[in-house]
Amino acid sequence: MSKFIVIEGLEGAGKSTAIKNVLATLAKHGITSPVTTREPGGTPLAEKMRELVKQGHPDEPLTDMAELLLLYAARAQLVGNVIKPALAKGEWVVGDRHDLSSQAYQGGGRGFDRDLMMTMRNTVLGDFKPDLTIYMDIDPKLGLQRASARGELDRIEQMKLDFFERSRERYLEFANSDESIITIDAGQDLETVTQSIITALEAWLVNNGY
């Protein structure tokens, strides 16, 4: 039976490395070549929306509401045209971000009303949600240091520290109240983080009969 696994976290949390570990662990269990996605993005139209969200436009500021709507428009394209069809064919899907990012960044960071965020989620996704979310938790200050070391920061990465502190609070709020979310301490050394991800995913796979 197909499953949808998502990796979440703030900037610099190590999501890319986590995804590699997830893919390697799945392969050991005979789950090879899962569909991989990223949000925003993952389809031709959604990638154009990603560019707007990440880079903005030099002649016009992107409003917070426009950003929110672009993110959900991109998500609707990805879920409808890629994720759901793949799952229907029995394929596994591994995603770099999903709706929890919007709940954290737009709901927590931007401060959008909780009811609005739930309405957006329910309208676009209904009862569709990941089977497992691996949340890479990191102190925002350390995460931004790591992100800065990678090179030029995009529009979101340039937000001030308090934005990411609010986003982290919302991430943790969801993680602490949803059994389908596993929290990994991403502030540890790489070897420890890697082993934590593998151990958690192995346990989840065994519990689900894989």
UniProtKB/Swiss-Prot annotation:
PANTHER family: THYMIDYLATE KINASE, UMP-CMP KINASE 2, MITOCHONDRIAL. InterPro entries: P-loop_NTPase, Thymidylate_kin-like_dom, Thymidylate_kin_CS, Thymidylate_kinase. The gene is tmk. It is an enzyme of class 2 (transferase). ATP binds at G9, L10, E11, G12, A13, G14, K15, S16. Coiled coil: none annotated. The keyword Manganese does not apply. Belongs to the thymidylate kinase family. One of its GO terms (molecular function) is dTMP kinase activity. It comes from the Bacteria. Its EC number is 2.7.4.9. This is Thymidylate kinase. One of its GO terms (cellular component) is cytosol. GO terms for biological process: dTDP biosynthetic process; dTTP biosynthetic process; dUDP biosynthetic process. Pfam families: Thymidylate_kin. Keywords: ATP-binding, Kinase, Nucleotide biosynthesis, Nucleotide-binding, Transferase. Phosphorylation of dTMP to form dTDP in both de novo and salvage pathways of dTTP synthesis. SUPFAM superfamilies: P-loop containing nucleoside triphosphate hydrolases (SSF52540).
